[in-house]
From Swiss-Prot:
It comes from the Bacteria. The keyword Ubl conjugation does not apply. NCBIfam families: nuoB_fam (TIGR01957), PRK06411.1 (NF005012). NDH-1 is composed of 14 different subunits. Subunits NuoB, C, D, E, F, and G constitute the peripheral sector of the complex. It is found in: Cell inner membrane. Gene3D superfamilies: 3.40.50.12280. GO terms for cellular component: plasma membrane; respiratory chain complex I. It catalyses: a quinone + NADH + 5 H(+)(in) = a quinol + NAD(+) + 4 H(+)(out). Its EC number is 7.1.1.-. One of its GO terms (biological process) is electron transport coupled proton transport. This is NADH-quinone oxidoreductase subunit B.
């Protein structure tokens, strides 16, 4: 459409979910749901993430919060404290000396907590895979929910990973993980 900025592929919210909600509210004038589903719906729109930027992928985390991509339009906002955050984004090479700190920060997060592993180094060690000091994937230290591939992944890839996490929360709920 003229006058609209082009939207990067994969950065629109789950349109079918919102169409179903608006259709039900439009037909009946109200929405019937369970408390658990209501909490899951609210949780997907208010994810507070904590950065665990270890290397060059952290620059893309900064990039995704700038006006061009504006991650806050999906209800995802950064927090400085692990006690206030629901999501941890691990970006970069995880060394053996940093692994206990990662676990400690993860343990300080409140439940339910989710982890996004961002980049080749966080996913499996990346370029430094065979080094004696590198953990071959942060999933050996903390449970990972979403893997975002790339070296470094683009801002669009991280946004897509966040949207996949929102879909996973809606699909599985908070009790099953």
């Amino acid at each position: 459409m003229p006058g609209q900025m082009p939207v990067a592929p994969g950065t629109n919210p789950d349109q079918s979910f919102f169409d179903d909600l608006s259709g039900e509210v439009g037909d009946k004038g109200f929405l019937v749901t369970s408390t658990e589903d209501l909490f899951n719906w609210a949780r997907t729109g208010s994810l507070w993430w904590m950065t665990f930027g270890l290397a060059c992928c952290a620059v893309e985390m900064i990039h995704v919060n700038m006006p061009r991509y504006d991650m806050e339009r999906f209800g995802v906002a950064p927090r400085a404290s692990p006690r206030q955050s629901d999501v941890m984004i691990v970006a970069g090479t995880l060394c053996n000396k940093m692994a206990p700190a990662l676990r400690r920060v993860y343990d300080q997060m409140s439940n339910p907590k989710y982890v996004i592993s961002m980049g080749s180094c966080a996913n499996g060690g990346g370029y430094y895979h065979y080094s004696y000091s590198v953990v071959r994937g942060c999933d050996r230290i903390v449970p990972v929910d979403i893997y975002v591939p790339g070296c470094p992944p683009t801002a669009e890839a991280l946004l897509y990973g966040v949207m996949q996490l929102q879909r996973k929360i809606r699909r599985t709920g908070t009790i099953e993980r």
